């Protein structure tokens, strides 16, 4: 019996995908299926096979982005859990087993994220869960720091969807990834929605993943990435915060936009960032964007209050 479906979105990443699958073949836990959703690759990715894994490749004719590919995979999933895994990763032998054990500790746990380690330096972290602040910033916890300092399982704001397990029944209740994001911050939005509904997200250091990073986009900063991240920053705020919370956080949000504008001006992407912010405002004001806003429910009031306190506390946290 299979408990887990591992969904791997792929776009022109044949070599990366082959390496990722080789490490999945060595897992201590065998009760999983691999579903590769290919976003119209031109490099022969759909020809990749495995003689060991129970594996299926869904070949798309167009690039639906990370969110679209994942949601299509979710629609085809019949297992109680899914693992989202980037194609530019290689995993430890206990990766699946550790994530499954972690999420089964409590039915209140929606997701558990792996310890994502720098591919070139296995002593340095890439991600140990995500934090979110009143500035509207999502911060990769532990990035660039020693793995040895992040060996404790803890609750986090959200999990990086590059290597995390999710509970399917909760996904069906709160919805999958928002395809208006296309890519970037979609996992923060998903974790935020789960937190509003009263669920928890955890970091699990026993599940280890070695992450190349920016393998599909090619660089850490580029026009498309900066634009989407800026646009989605605004959309995450609009979607998940009630109006009174947006007003309460507005001084911090405006400060966050100002600081990021200066930062991207120095990188040569100031105009692109500003364009993304405008696009985020327009998306939030549109009929389509408004339809995606999380409806406020009085039963979730304590969850909103707890989240707001965390947004303030995270302003001063050393990640």
Feature locations, PLM:
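A short, conserved alpha-helix in the catalytic core of glycosyltransferases
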Residues: 157-208
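Non-catalytic, C-terminal membrane-associated alpha-helical segments of glycosyltransferases
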Residues: 246-319
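Short, acidic, metal-binding catalytic loop of nucleotide-sugar glycosyltransferases
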Residues: 22-31
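Short aromatic/hydrophobic "clamp" motif used to bind/position activated sugar donors
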Residues: 82
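Glycine-rich, basic loop-to-helix element that forms the pyrophosphate-binding segment
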Residues: 59-77, 87, 98
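Conserved donor NDP-sugar-binding/catalytic core segment of glycosyltransferases
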Residues: 89-133
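A recurrent flexible, glycine/aromatic-enriched loop bordering the glycosyltransferase active site
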Residues: 124-125, 137-139, 145-166, 183, ...
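A conserved acidic beta->alpha catalytic loop
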Residues: 23, 38-47, 62
């Amino acid at each position: 019996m299979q408990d887990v479906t591992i969904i791997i979105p792929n776009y022109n990443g044949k070599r990366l995908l082959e390496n990722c699958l080789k490490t999945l073949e060595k897992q201590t836990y065998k009760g999983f299926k691999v579903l590769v959703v290919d976003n119209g690759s031109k490099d022969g990715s759909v020809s990749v096979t495995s003689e060991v894994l129970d594996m299926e490749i869904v070949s798309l004719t167009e690039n639906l982005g990370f969110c679209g590919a994942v949601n299509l995979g979710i629609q085809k999933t019949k297992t109680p859990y899914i693992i989202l895994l980037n194609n530019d990763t290689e995993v430890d032998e206990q990766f699946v087993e550790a994530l499954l054990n972690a999420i089964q500790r409590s039915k209140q746990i929606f997701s558990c994220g792996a310890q994502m380690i720098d591919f070139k330096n296995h002593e340095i972290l890439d991600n140990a869960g995500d934090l979110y602040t009143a500035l509207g910033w999502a911060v990769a916890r532990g990035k660039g720091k020693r793995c040895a300092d992040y060996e404790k399982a803890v609750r986090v704001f959200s999990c990086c969807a590059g290597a995390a397990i999710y509970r399917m029944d909760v996904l069906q209740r709160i919805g999958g990834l928002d395809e208006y994001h296309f890519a970037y911050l979609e996992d923060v939005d998903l974790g935020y929605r789960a937190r509003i509904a009263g669920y928890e997200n955890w970091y699990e250091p026993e599940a280890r993943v070695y992450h190349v990073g920016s393998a599909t986009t090619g660089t850490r900063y580029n026009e498309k990435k900066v634009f989407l991240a800026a646009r989605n920053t605004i959309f995450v705020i609009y979607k998940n915060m009630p109006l009174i919370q947006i007003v309460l956080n507005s001084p911090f949000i405006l400060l966050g936009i100002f600081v990021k504008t200066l930062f991207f001006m120095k990188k040569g992407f100031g105009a692109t960032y500003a364009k993304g912010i405008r696009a985020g405002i327009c998306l939030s004001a549109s009929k389509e964007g408004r339809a995606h806003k999380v409806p406020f429910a009085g039963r979730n009031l304590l969850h909103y209050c707890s989240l707001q306190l965390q947004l303030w506390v995270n302003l001063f946290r050393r990640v």
